[in-house]
Amino acid sequence: MSAHKNVEKVIYPTLYKREVANRAKKYFKGGNGALVGIEIKGGVEAGKKFIDSLKLLYHVANIGDARSLAIHPATTTHSQLTEKELLAAGVTPGYVRLSVGIEHPDDIIADLKQALETSGNVKLKAVS
């Protein structure tokens, strides 16, 4: 995902700088787990469009289900916060949280790819 043109950043423990990655490997003996964060280019509208474009992943606030789940915190769980408060909480406008379930990996990857392609088609509105 990190190489996709519409992805700003992938947030996953072993993808961080060496110090953080080494700690993740030390403490997460069985692997990193199924939670992944991605920052989608294009801000809030692109994040919303990504979520709306998912066909396999469910758009829900809980995590840790057998099903793959996705949420856009800026417009759901954290929507009551100001832009400054969102950033202080580490929630960027295009941030999407994923909880990967037990579906076939190829199906999950295909759904994420098509949603990323769709999210890149956001038309920015001019502000006067």
Regions from the PLM with identified roles:
Residues 52-53, 68-128:
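PLP-dependent enzyme catalytic core of the Aspartate aminotransferase-like
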Residues 58-60, 106-107:
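Short amphipathic alpha-helical segments with coiled-coil-like heptad repeat character
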Residues 1-55, 61-67, 81-87, 114, ...:
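Conserved small-domain helix->loop->beta segment predominantly found in fold-type I
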